Amino acid sequence: MIKRIIEDLDTALQKDPSARYRLEVALTFPGVHAVWGHRIAHLLWRRGFKLFARIYANWVRAVTGIEIHPAARIGRRFFIDHGMGVVIGETAEVGDDVMIYHDVTLGSRKYAKGKRHPTIGDRVVIGAGARILGPITVGEGARISANSVVTSDIPARTNQDESELFSI
């Protein structure tokens, strides 16, 4: 557990040029707090304490402004920069070394049972304000531009221009 905490702190130091040292990150970075909160809520969820997981996740959202459903699967070295307004849905899956900016939604497109949120591959970067909706896949190493609306699969190592992705 301590190794994972240090790994999360070091990830912030590597990905955010404003981060100067571990203590600063641990005390002042809401994205890191949300990831830690999610790891605890997810553990509770997996162990069958679903109500407590939801209550705890709601508390984390109130404190950080970041909503991650406790059932969502989040990989290692996940970093949320700034974070306010981030929403990650129940069936979302996020790979390792993923970075997202503020106001990103990994959401569903309609009410449905089963898989309804996106799967994000390893080493993906998602720009501020992006909306990735539905049970789609964003391939490994892809970069999603700010304010994009993505409703279909994105191949691995794709650097999408927002004009190619935005739909009304």
Where on the chain are the PLM-derived regions?
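Terminal amphipathic alpha-helical/low-complexity segments used for targeting or macromolecular assembly
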Residues: 1-64, 166-168
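Left-handed beta-helix
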Residues: 64, 69-70, 75-76, 81-90, ...
